[in-house]
């Protein structure tokens, strides 16, 4: 309750899987953002996560699809709509594959200073969480 009184938003990065860390994070969530990649394994994990959140009675669920590569989507004959259908969630945002992201993570340099593209995608997602109507980026 102290956190709710102090902050407008508190983001918790729950661990992969549906173990204790996931349940602890979901117990206090007003909203859940399921983050997935476009590969089949990630989409199956997203489906399981959504099913568990539904079972727990959690609402206000959204999807972020990360590490999106246009060429890979074409070669797999998949689309962002396929990811939305698999998860059964509305899309909050798409993050393009960007090799500057690991560089920023490993060096501690803010992503905004390394990559305008991925940083803009994350900023757009944050703005949508705050209720702003921001168009999706073209990948």
Please describe what each predicted stretch is.
Residues 2-5, 26-27, 55-57:
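Conserved catalytic network of the ASCE P-loop NTPase/AAA+ motor domain
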Residues 12, 34, 62-65:
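Structural beta-sheet core signal
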Residues 2, 49-52, 128:
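A generic secondary-structure signal
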Residues 43-61:
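Conserved C-terminal guanine-recognition region of P-loop GTPase G domains, centered on the G4
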Residues 55-139:
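C-terminal lobe/tail of nucleotide-utilizing enzymes
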Residues 14-19, 28-47:
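Conserved Switch II/interswitch segment of TRAFAC-class P-loop GTPases
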Residues 1-21:
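Phosphate-binding/switch loop-helix module in NTP-utilizing enzymes
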């Amino acid at each position: 309750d102290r956190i709710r009184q102090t902050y407008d938003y508190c983001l918790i990065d729950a661990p992969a899987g549906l173990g204790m860390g996931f349940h602890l994070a979901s117990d206090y969530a007003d909203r859940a953002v399921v983050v997935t990649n476009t590969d089949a394994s990630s989409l199956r994990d997203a489906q399981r996560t959504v099913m568990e959140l539904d079972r727990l009675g959690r609402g206000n669920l959204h999807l972020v699809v990360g590490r999106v590569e246009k060429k890979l989507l074409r070669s797999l004959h998949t689309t962002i709509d396929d990811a939305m259908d698999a998860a059964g969630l509305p899309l909050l945002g798409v993050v393009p594959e960007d090799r500057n992201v690991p560089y920023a993570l490993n060096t501690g340099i803010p992503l905004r200073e390394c990559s305008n593209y991925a940083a803009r995608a994350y900023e757009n997602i944050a703005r949508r969480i705050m209720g702003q109507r921001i168009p999706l980026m073209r990948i």
